[in-house]
């Protein structure tokens, strides 16, 4: 990147959005070469202009830019303090970094199929894409199950953009593989998350925090938190500005051990951030205002292994648990109302508040451990943690 400065996320958001117009045009310019019918091209244009991609908080893309800039500032400071004229990182420009940020945002293609599996109504304040009027025939048809193919299209656009801008970069294969790995983990997480819908109603043996953690780690932790940091590290080859310069006699085994310890800490922190963030989403699904969170909750109807039901499974008395087993996972308003009333009866909101504070403090301690090894990387994770803490949507 040409210049390194503390990023202003509000200003950066404006610049970031401008880059999306360029990437859309890259895709649009490619479509005529495929000799597609004009209505198919119009369909894809409407898809790429939908809130599915651009209507969110852009947490992944902007978070990545913050991570990358933080590491680059630290590397520059280290190089300047040690008269090191290493220009290796100039290989990636600010514009290219924003493109990678948008590739991270393209991972929202998972939301399309997630909404179908969850029978969702709204997403990001709009109708879910599969419920959206069909661009082919908006007066008579919804997008419907064609949305499954649309999610594959968006995934393909991600790799089209990666190839267009980064195929000649030394890190292209690594970047490509990181995205594929993250998609693999997320798809596995989606499988785990949706599997409870197929379980027998009233069977709560699956509703444990052990199972819940595995869902969160695979479904959320990898692509929301871990991937952006891994890519930022890949692009910087950082030498932390808080560590003393090591001489040539430092043994390779010691360096490898330190790197392994750092990697393990980062991974565990990201995993716990994913659990924390998913628990927040679960709480909003039940108790949030759809106008604020931008979607209508369906976890109770879909028999989801959510934080709320896992907690209830551990604290309910027999009568309350029997009522939950009778009503949880049913798609009618009366049963949903009974479940919510029991959640309130056992004071789930208070238990959630305690969990949020405990999770914040626990992750903060892990970040403090990381700061001893790598101050810049700990700053990134602290930034992500503060973005989550007490969020309202």
From Swiss-Prot:
Origin organism is Dictyostelium discoideum
| Residues reported in the UniProt entry to bind isopentenyl diphosphate | 57, 60, 124
Q: Which GO terms describe its cellular component?
A: cytoplasm
> What is the protein name stated in its UniProt record?
Probable farnesyl diphosphate synthase DDB_G0268742
Q: Which PROSITE patterns match?
A: POLYPRENYL_SYNTHASE_1 (PS00723)
Amino acids binding Mg(2+) 1: 114, 118
Q: Which Pfam family would be a valid example here? A: polyprenyl_synt
Question: Where does this protein chiefly localize?
Answer: cytoplasm
Q: Which GO terms describe its molecular function?
A: (2E,6E)-farnesyl diphosphate synthase activity; dimethylallyltranstransferase activity; metal ion binding
Please name the SUPFAM superfamilies in this protein's record: Terpenoid synthases
Q: Can you quote the record's cofactor note? A: Binds 2 Mg(2+) ions per subunit.
Name what cofactor the protein needs: Mg(2+)
- Characterize the regulation of its activity: Inhibited by aminobisphosphonate drugs (aBP), such as risedronate and alendronate.
Please give the catalytic activity noted in the UniProt record.
Answer: isopentenyl diphosphate + dimethylallyl diphosphate = (2E)-geranyl diphosphate + diphosphate; isopentenyl diphosphate + (2E)-geranyl diphosphate = (2E,6E)-farnesyl diphosphate + diphosphate
